[in-house]
């Protein structure tokens, strides 16, 4: 582990990570690295809740709008690009602030993931390879989604080798692959994880309102443009896109698509919160408390002062 600081803001979708990250970056001289697995895609702006240029307030943001929607993006690709971004940020005398929602992506940067000591089972791998050849990559990926939704979110269906490895580790250990990742990894930096949370019903209402706001802002049109271009694959599996694709395919009504979008967003928020509560040493701040934001700023200032950044 290096003594270089890395602060990450984590927590469920719609809790307010983006806005807080920008405020912290402006106050303490940081540049932001997006830990969201879908904000890398150009033209997918509304559904991924990207900050607008105005909201960014001149703060450099990294790993946003770097790929076309048809391109593949993996945990390892994120790790490589994020480490390069950190080196670049530090060369300018700034410090990196990771703002993320995808658990494995955050862990891939904060920790040195290693599976060299994990067990193996060649017969199980052969069985899974046969399954994929018979039923397809999506069916194999579906197995992982049932066993470990967090791992499935981070591993693309076409990365068959990685999917099989995840299933193999689950098969042999009885534990989620995503849990193994963190358990076998050492911290890469002097990490500080700031967890944001609020009362669950308040968060769910906030999610529902954000979905309504996204629709008013033009999410239907944004997704329809992708649909007309014939975009398939990883990008359109994101929440907000897959539900509206189903509507355009005639598989559900408009109202059913919106309700599915809200339901899936709430479920995702619950998974995110569970992930970070169980798999990280984040310091949690309840945003409904009056002094929560002031406490966060004091906490960050004290940490950076100890590192010579404040």
From Swiss-Prot:
It comes from the Bacteria. Pfam families: IPPT. InterPro entries: Dimethylallyltransferase, IPT, P-loop_NTPase. It catalyses: adenosine(37) in tRNA + dimethylallyl diphosphate = N(6)-dimethylallyladenosine(37) in tRNA + diphosphate. Gene3D superfamilies: 1.10.20.140, P-loop containing nucleotide triphosphate hydrolases. Residues 36-39 are annotated as: Interaction with substrate tRNA. The record marks 102, 125 as: Interaction with substrate tRNA. Its cofactor is Mg(2+). Its EC number is 2.5.1.75. GO terms for biological process: tRNA modification. Substrate binds at residues 13-18. Disulfide bonds: none annotated. It is an enzyme of class 2 (transferase). One of its GO terms (molecular function) is ATP binding. PANTHER family: TRNA DIMETHYLALLYLTRANSFERASE. Belongs to the IPP transferase family. Monomer. Catalyzes the transfer of a dimethylallyl group onto the adenine at position 37 in tRNAs that read codons beginning with uridine, leading to the formation of N6-(dimethylallyl)adenosine (i(6)A). This is tRNA dimethylallyltransferase.
């Amino acid at each position: 582990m290096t003594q270089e600081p890395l602060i990450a803001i984590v927590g469920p979708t719609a809790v307010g990570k983006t806005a807080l990250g920008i405020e912290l970056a402006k106050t303490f001289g940081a540049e932001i690295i997006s830990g969201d697995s879908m904000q890398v895609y150009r033209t997918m702006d509304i559904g991924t809740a990207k900050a607008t240029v105005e909201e960014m307030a001149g703060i450099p943001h990294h790993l946003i709008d770097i790929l076309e929607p048809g391109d593949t993006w993996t945990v390892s690709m994120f790790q490589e690009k994020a480490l390069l971004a950190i080196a670049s940020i530090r060369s300018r005398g700034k410090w990196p602030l990771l703002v993320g929602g995808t658990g494995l992506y955050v862990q891939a940067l904060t920790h040195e993931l290693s599976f060299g000591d994990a067990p193996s089972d060649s017969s199980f791998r052969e069985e899974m390879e046969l399954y994929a050849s018979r039923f397809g990559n999506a069916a194999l990926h579906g197995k992982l989604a049932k066993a470990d939704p967090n791992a499935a979110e981070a591993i693309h269906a076409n990365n068959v080798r990685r999917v099989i490895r995840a299933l193999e580790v689950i098969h042999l250990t009885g534990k989620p692959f995503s849990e193994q990742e963190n358990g076998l990894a050492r911290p890469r930096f002097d990490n500080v994880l700031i967890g944001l949370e609020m009362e669950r019903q308040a968060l769910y209402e906030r999610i529902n309102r954000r979905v309504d706001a996204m629709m008013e802002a033009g999410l239907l049109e944004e997704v329809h443009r992708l649909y007309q271009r014939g975009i398939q694959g990883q990008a359109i599996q994101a929440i907000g896109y897959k539900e509206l694709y189903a509507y355009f395919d005639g598989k559900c009504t408009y109202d059913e698509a919106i309700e599915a979008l809200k339901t899936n967003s709430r479920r995702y928020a619950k998974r995110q919160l569970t992930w970070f509560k169980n798999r990280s040493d984040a310091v949690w701040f309840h945003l409904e408390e009056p002094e929560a934001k002031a406490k966060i700023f004091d906490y960050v200032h004290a940490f950076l002062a100890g590192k010579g950044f404040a």
